[in-house]
């Protein structure tokens, strides 16, 4: 009887100790290769900072950047004499890349939207047979329209394509175009390779709408300085509030970091952790890591 009593006392003490002094699980980082343009690079660069904050040891990334269409997988592949193309190949040739990330961009005039991604995955597998692939899905550009071109503002762009809102149009882009026309096809071509997506662009879409609806706790402009705006220019490049949110989406998508427990100061009063988590929760689980 005394033994049983002491046993339950011990269990009680251990359970209390666990609650009062939770042990942090330390996770090994990945060796990553990340290739893309200016709607990809800010998150790739900032991920290094957040992995440090999350105590992810030995996270390492090689980031290869080219602006605009030049940063799409197909252009990075076809422009074979460029320094960027050679850097991607030489990095993959080392045979130690665990995660390879790229954009969903492709030539809309091509009959094969997976051509660029497929070429790079084929090359990567030669020396990295267990490599994991992710495709980061960017936002649409030119939120207020292109003053030097024919692209209208987002609302008109959505309406012209038969959608009631830019959110509805973007949801179609993510789920019907990127997932079905790119990812599903790549999975058929590479059945033994893990391929998932990161819904980065929702950070821009949701924060922009929240700002229009006066739902942000910070004084944020739609267009202006990087530190205090959703967009920094007409093209729609990201302000810091978008970068912080989008990079936390990356952190969770790649490393499964619980954002509700992630003690990181974004520099904003708005609960960007919750916004990022909502986006992650809404992402189709069939396309998660």
Where are these regions (language model features)?
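Conserved SGNH/GDSL esterase-like catalytic core that processes O-acyl groups on lipids
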Residues: 30-35, 39-123, 129, 282
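Soluble non-cytosolic domains of exported or imported proteins
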Residues: 26, 38-42, 110-115, 173-174, ...
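Sec-dependent signal peptide recognition
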Residues: 1-10
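Alpha-helical cap/lid subdomain in secreted, periplasmic
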Residues: 89-240
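Amphipathic alpha-helical segments that form well-ordered structural scaffolds
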Residues: 46, 123, 178, 182-185, ...
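Bacterial Sec-dependent N-terminal signal peptides
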Residues: 14-29
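Conserved catalytic region of serine esterases and O-acyltransferases that act on ester linkages
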Residues: 213-289
């Amino acid at each position: 009887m005394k033994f049983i009593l002491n046993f339950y006392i011990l269990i009680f003490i251990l359970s209390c100790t666990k609650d009062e002094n939770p042990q942090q699980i330390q996770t090994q980082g990945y060796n990553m290769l990340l290739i893309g343009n200016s709607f990809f690079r800010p998150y790739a660069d900032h991920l290094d900072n957040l992995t440090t904050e999350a105590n992810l040891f030995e996270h390492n990334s090689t980031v290869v950047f080219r602006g605009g269409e030049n940063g799409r997988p197909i252009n990075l592949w076809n422009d074979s004499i460029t320094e960027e193309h050679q850097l991607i190949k030489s990095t993959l040739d080392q045979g130690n890349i665990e995660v390879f990330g790229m954009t969903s961009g492709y030539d809309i005039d091509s009959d094969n939207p997976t051509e660029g991604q497929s070429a790079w995955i084929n090359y990567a597998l030669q020396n990295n047979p267990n490599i994991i692939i992710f495709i980061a899905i960017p936002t649409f550009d030119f939120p207020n329209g292109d003053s030097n071109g024919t692209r209208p503002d987002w609302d008109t762009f959505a309406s012209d394509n038969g959608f009631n809102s830019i959110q509805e149009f973007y949801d179609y882009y993510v789920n019907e175009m990127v997932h079905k026309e790119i990812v599903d096809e790549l999975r058929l071509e590479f059945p033994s390779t893990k391929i998932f997506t990161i819904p980065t662009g929702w950070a821009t879409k949701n924060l922009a709408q929240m700002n229009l609806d006066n739902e942000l706790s910070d004084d944020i402009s739609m267009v202006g300085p990087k530190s205090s705006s959703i967009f920094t220019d007409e093209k729609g490049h990201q302000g810091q509030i978008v970068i912080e949110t989008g990079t936390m989406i990356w952190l969770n998508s790649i490393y499964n970091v619980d954002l509700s427990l992630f003690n990181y100061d974004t520099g904003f009063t708005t609960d960007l952790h919750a916004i990022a988590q909502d986006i992650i929760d809404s992402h189709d689980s069939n396309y998660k890591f």
